[in-house]
Amino acid sequence: MAKILVAEDEAPLRGHILRALAANGHDSVSTADGGEAIEALAGHGGRFDLLLTDIKMPVMDGIALALVAARDYPGLAILLMTGYADQRERACGLEALIEGVLTKPFSLAELNRAVGDALRRVSRSKVA
């Protein structure tokens, strides 16, 4: 299926996300912060279909990561996650760059739906 980069600083949540993605046939790589995510993107030649990133993380937050990823890897789908209302508001200015924002806590069904929707939208835009 898709190759997904997950940037999430909370290890238990990161593990749940990786298991859910694997159960749906996705190949995932995980990082604990935005700095590691930038290294992973570069190390894999940007060959990811989706970046799923928390907004509030150490080293580099998800907003900064999304801006760099969108600039350096056009065509990469970006989906943000947050449990904070003020962080969700910060993401509002990024509509043109991201596929959406998942509000924590979210169910596995919500995660799977958001990932599937993001991948479909990006796939359609690559064809158009």
What are these regions, as identified by a protein language model?
Residues D33-E36, D61-L65:
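Acidic catalytic/metal-coordinating carboxylates
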Residues F106-A118, S123, V127:
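C-terminal output helix
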